[in-house]
Every structure is written in C-alpha cells, then in structure tokens.
From Swiss-Prot:
It holds the Pfam family F-box. Residues 25-71 form the F-box domain. InterPro entries: F-box-like_dom_sf (IPR036047), F-box_dom (IPR001810), PP2-like (IPR025886). GO terms for molecular function: carbohydrate binding. It comes from the Eukaryota. This is F-box protein PP2-A12. The lineage of its organism: Eukaryota, Viridiplantae, Streptophyta, Embryophyta, Tracheophyta.
Length: 291
C-alpha cells in the first residue's frame, strides 16, 4: 500500500486539475495556422519548404495562397499568359510558383524564362537561334554545334568573318525593376576528350585588335552603349551590354532591342562561340554561372 500511495503522490505532483502539466506548455504546434502563415510570409521560398516539415501547422501554412502569392512576381498573370498563351485557372498559388521556378520554353523554344528561387525575380534567356546573326546561314562562316554547356543544347560557332553583327529583341512583361542584359560568349570551341572538357582555341583571332561594341535600346527612350575587348579564352563569359529600368507606366510589356558588333573590315574575326543573351534582375546578376 505504501508503494501505491507513493505512486499516487508522484502522479498528483506531476499533474493538475487541468491534466498533465506538459499539455499546458504551448509549442509551435499550438499556433493557429493563420498566425503561422504570417510568420511564413517573411521567409524565402526555400526556407518555407524547410519549415513545412516542422509540424502540421507549418505544413498547412506552407500551402496557403496568401503565402505564395507574396512570392510570385507582381504581374505573374501577364508572365504566365506570355509563356502559356493563357492563364491556368483553378491552380493554387503554390503550384503557380512551382511552375514559374522551373525553366519554361516559349517562342519555338528559342527563349526560356524562370524566376529566381530566392528573390522571385524574373530571368530570361534567348538562344543564338533566336537572334539575327549576319551570315548565320552560310556554313563558311557559322555553324550550330551541339553542347551540354548551353541551356539550349547548342551554340552558334563562328569560323571566320569580316563583318560581325548580332541583333535581337525581346518583348516581355517584366515586373517593375532594373534588369541587366548580358551576351554569353566563349573564345574557342568546347568539347569532350575521353570524358574531360577541352576547348579548342586554334581558330580564335581578331578580337584583340578592335573592341566589340554592345548596344541596347527600349521603346521609352533608354539607351546604353559600351565597348569591350574579348581576350579571355576557353571559358564562358557574360559580357554586360547594359541595364534597363522597367517602370510602372510600361509594366504591361517591355520591348528591348540589343546588338553586338565588330564591323571593322580591315581584319577578320573568328573562333567565337555564341550561346545566348540573358536578362537578369540587376540584384541577381552575381549569380550568373561561369563555365
């Protein structure tokens, strides 16, 4: 009986008239889902997915439309309509975000667009096949070569030419912000040798004599021009063509024209690989990968 009395005393000392005292200690799992959603809104998308594994409340909040709408571009409807040709109805915002964070092709697969998973900024890439390149149809000058070093699985390679000119344009509903435009180039032709990356630079010539000129224009009068000598061989480099500011007044769609030229016909140029033109939010440009 003494043992039973002792056990009863211990049970009473660890409980109260309201039940086990541990039940009275609030935890993260006791927070209302609406409150958790407010907390989760302040996290970036990667962190939201991690916190969704904590408990049921965080898992439920991680599916809330209000949370994911705050992570989508302000004009996400326009962006989706541009990519898909229409807006997908009856989809949760989380699914819309998941779709946009993947790389999506449009315009006959010559353009790809996605949103940065940390900042939700819109990024866009235009393949060499989506650009106007002088002499591209003459195989004496240019050829398209397959490669796994491009998002588009091929690049334009220049053997030799006197008049070098590349032009392009993009008409896209970029959200309000500042964007940087880059040409992704490499001096040399990369390939594989016994499974290892190699880059043949034997045909590289003419780029260290006169600089290449980059230009860009917008419909609202913005203009940028810069010159650069191409000197580094064997690596993909993003050459900055300029920046564009997208304002509230033209947020429905922004048309950007750009060019890269070296038209001094006193010498030939050759051995250049042209992959793409990329448009990144200026705040994300440090994330550009270099091969």
């Amino acid at each position: 009986m003494g043992v039973a009395h002792s056990d009863l005393h211990n049970d009473l000392s660890s409980s109260s008239c309201f039940g086990d005292r541990n039940i009275l200690k609030p935890g993260l799992g006791d927070l209302p889902e609406a409150c958790v959603a407010i907390i989760v809104e302040n996290l970036d998308p990667v962190e939201i997915c991690r916190f969704s594994k904590l408990n049921r409340a965080f898992r439920g909040a991680s599916w809330a439309d209000c949370v994911w709408e705050s992570k989508l571009p302000q004009n996400y409807r326009d962006v989706l309509e541009k990519i898909l040709g229409g807006f997908p109805e009856n989809l949760q915002k989380r699914h819309l975000y998941a779709f946009l964070s993947r790389i999506n092709s449009f315009d006959d697969a010559t353009k790809k667009v996605w949103i940065d998973k940390r900042t939700s900024g819109v990024c866009l890439s235009i393949s060499a096949k989506g650009l106007s390149i002088t002499g591209i149809d003459d195989r004496r000058y240019w050829s398209h070569i397959p490669t796994d070093e491009s998002r588009f699985s091929s690049v334009a390679y220049l053997q030799q030419i006197w008049w070098f000119e590349v032009d392009g344009e993009i008409d896209f509903p970029f959200p309000v912000g500042t964007y940087s435009i880059f040409f992704r180039l490499q001096l040399g032709r990369s390939g594989k040798w016994f499974g290892r990356r190699v880059c043949n630079t034997e045909q590289v010539h003419g780029w260290d004599i006169k600089p290449v000129r980059f230009q860009l224009w917008t419909e609202d009068g913005q203009y940028s021009s810069s010159q650069c000598m191409l000197t580094e061989r064997g690596n993909w480099i993003h050459y900055h063509a300029g920046d564009v500011v997208v304002r509230e007044s033209n947020r429905s769609s922004t048309k950007i024209k750009f060019s890269m030229t070296q038209i001094d016909c006193t010498h030939t140029k050759g051995g250049l690989s042209l992959d793409s033109v990329v448009v990144y939010p200026s705040s994300c440009k440090d994330q550009l990968k270099r091969f």
